[in-house]
Each structure stands twice: as C-alpha cells, then as structure tokens.
C-alpha cells in the first residue's frame, strides 16, 4: 500500500531527468512553457520524468551547446535510463505536461515543446496515455513513476510569471552532460 504522506519527493528542474523504481517516490516539477515527459514501464515497475525548455536539439550556434535544455537530448536520456533499469521499449507509456503560452509573443515555444514531445513519442512508437498541455498558466506537476499516477495544480498568474522568470534563466550548472546517446 502506498501512503501518500510517506512519499519520497524528488524535484526535477529544467534540464534534468530522473528514473526511479521506488513505489513511494513522487517526482515533481513546476512548468510554464517547458514540457515534462513522464514515461514508465508498468511491468518492470520503473518510470521517470524529464523537464526540457526547448524542442529539438542543440545544433544551432545560438544554443551554446547546452544539450540539457533540449527535448531530443532529454527524451533519449530518459528512455535510455528506463531501459538500463529493466524497462522494455515495447511496454513504455507516456504522459505529457506543460507547454503553456506564458508570454504574449508571436512565437509560442510552449506549443512547439508539446508538439515536439508528441511527435517524438509517436515516431518512437510510445503511446501517450495522458496529457495536459497548453493554456496560459503554468502548472505544478506530481508524478508517481511506478504507478503512473499524475496530479497537477494550476498556478496563479503571479506564480506563472515567477516560473517564466526561472525558465528564462540559464539552467543551473550540472555535471557534464552525457555526450553520447545510444539509439535503440
């Protein structure tokens, strides 16, 4: 039996991913225009989450080579992390969250992020069993990686603006990103 109050919380920030098999663990993040992909293998009892800022990859000169901000890199790392923990690709299922239009501009990076995640998963043959994307406000997300349960809380306008400010800052320095990705 999973007791919600006894949950071990693991917070994910922009540019990170985590893979867990602890049934009492809950992954959490706060999203504005960023997207979180939540994947799991229900048979292996393992799941994970990533949090990316931009769709595509870090191939443009403007990217500064920071692959951890980009969807392609974090999606591959999450899938590979799940496979290393015993998941099988043919059993993976996904839920997608975020992608709000938090700034009034001509470009809608949130919509692009959500579309990228959906297309990536479609191309990989991973079914999306749930999603909540778009809108004008951010959201706080909680995801139980073993059960696949997800819960989100809408953010107020002020909370959304704080989230936007955080998303526009460079990602926190981390250990060097894995530069090789194994494609299956």
From Swiss-Prot:
Keyword Hydrolase set for record: yes
Protein EC: 3.5.1.44
Taxonomic superkingdom: Bacteria
Catalytic activity: L-glutaminyl-[protein] + H2O = L-glutamyl-[protein] + NH4(+)
Group of enzyme by EC: hydrolase
GO BP term, example: chemotaxis
Keywords associated with the record: Chemotaxis, Hydrolase
Disulfide-bond pairs as recorded: none
InterPro entries for this protein: CheD-like_sf (IPR038592), Chemorcpt_Glu_NH3ase_CheD (IPR005659), Cytotoxic_necrot_fac-like_cat (IPR011324)
UniProt keyword Hydrolase present: yes
Its job: Probably deamidates glutamine residues to glutamate on methyl-accepting chemotaxis receptors (MCPs), playing an important role in chemotaxis.
Family to which the UniProt record says this protein belongs: Belongs to the CheD family.
Protein name per UniProt: Probable chemoreceptor glutamine deamidase CheD
Organism for this UniProt entry: Rhizobium etli (strain ATCC 51251 / DSM 11541 / JCM 21823 / NBRC 15573 / CFN 42)
């Amino acid at each position: 039996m999973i007791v919600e109050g006894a949950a071990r919380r693991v917070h994910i920030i922009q540019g990170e991913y985590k893979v867990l098999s602890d049934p009492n663990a809950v992954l959490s993040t706060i999203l504005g225009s960023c997207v979180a992909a939540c994947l799991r293998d229900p048979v292996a009892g393992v799941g994970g989450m990533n949090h990316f800022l931009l769709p595509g990859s870090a191939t443009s000169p403007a990217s500064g080579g920071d692959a951890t901000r980009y969807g392609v890199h974090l999606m591959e790392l999450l899938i590979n992390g799940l496979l290393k923990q015993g998941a099988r690709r043919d059993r993976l299922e996904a839920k997608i969250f975020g992608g709000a239009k938090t700034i009034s501009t001509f470009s809608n990076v949130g919509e692009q992020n959500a579309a990228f995640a959906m297309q990536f998963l479609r191309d990989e043959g991973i079914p999306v069993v749930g999603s909540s994307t778009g809108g004008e406000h951010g959201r706080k997300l909680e995801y139980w990686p073993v059960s696949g349960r997800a819960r989100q809380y809408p953010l107020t306008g002020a909370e959304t603006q704080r989230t936007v400010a955080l998303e526009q800052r460079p990602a926190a320095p981390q250990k060097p990103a894995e530069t090789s990705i194994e494609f299956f």
